[in-house]
């Protein structure tokens, strides 16, 4: 498997490690999203401690307004973070 294919599988795996702990196994609730960000993105994003921050992140990601983050919305988030990191490291 190529590095890109491994990365794609890892993204799917990480999403499903956190989704469905508290409901729909295909979506992240706010608490699941917070845990995922704090555990899996700790080198790129600050730890989320305040509920307001979680609410704001979810509001930004939740395109369909269901109060949860589906895989497509999660991937949009990953793309945003990856783009920001790429731009940061490109200028160093």
Swiss-Prot record:
Under the heading InterPro entries, the entry gives:
EF-hand-dom_pair, EF_Hand_1_Ca_BS, EF_hand_dom, S100-B, S100/CaBP7/8-like_CS, S100_Ca-bd_sub
Tissue specificity as recorded in UniProt: Although predominant among the water-soluble brain proteins, S100 is also found in a variety of other tissues.
Name recorded for this polypeptide: Protein S100-B
Biological process terms from the Gene Ontology for this record are:
adaptive thermogenesis; astrocyte differentiation; axonogenesis; cell adhesion; cellular response to hypoxia; central nervous system development; learning or memory; long-term synaptic potentiation
Which species is the source of this protein? Homo sapiens
Q: Lineage in the entry?
A: Eukaryota, Metazoa, Chordata, Craniata, Vertebrata
Which CDD domains did the record assign?
S-100B
Q: Which GO terms describe its cellular component?
A: ciliary basal body; cilium; cytoplasm; cytosol; extracellular region; extracellular space; intracellular membrane-bounded organelle; microtubule cytoskeleton
Q: What does this protein do?
A: Small zinc- and- and calcium-binding protein that is highly expressed in astrocytes and constitutes one of the most abundant soluble proteins in brain. Weakly binds calcium but binds zinc very tightly-distinct binding sites with different affinities exist for both ions on each monomer. Physiological concentrations of potassium ion antagonize the binding of both divalent cations, especially affecting high-affinity calcium-binding sites. Acts as a neurotrophic factor that promotes astrocytosis and axonal proliferation.
Keyword Metal-binding on entry: yes
PROSITE patterns xref list: EF_HAND_1, EF_HAND_2, S100_CABP
Pfam families named among the record's database cross-references: EF-hand_1, S_100
Instruction: Mark the residues carrying the PTM Blocked amino end (Ser).
Output: 2
Name the positions where Ca(2+) 1 binds. 19, 22, 24, 27, 32
In-chain residues carrying the UniProt-annotated modification N-acetylserine: 2
Record has Metal-binding as a keyword: yes
Q: Which residues bind Ca(2+) 2?
A: 62, 64, 66, 68, 73
Assembly mode: Dimer of either two alpha chains, or two beta chains, or one alpha and one beta chain. The S100B dimer binds two molecules of STK38. Interacts with CACYBP in a calcium-dependent manner. Interacts with ATAD3A; this interaction probably occurs in the cytosol prior to ATAD3A mitochondrial targeting. Interacts with S100A6. The S100B dimer interacts with two molecules of CAPZA1. Interacts with AGER. Interacts with PPP5C (via TPR repeats); the interaction is calcium-dependent and modulates PPP5C activity. Interacts with TPPP; this interaction inhibits TPPP dimerization.
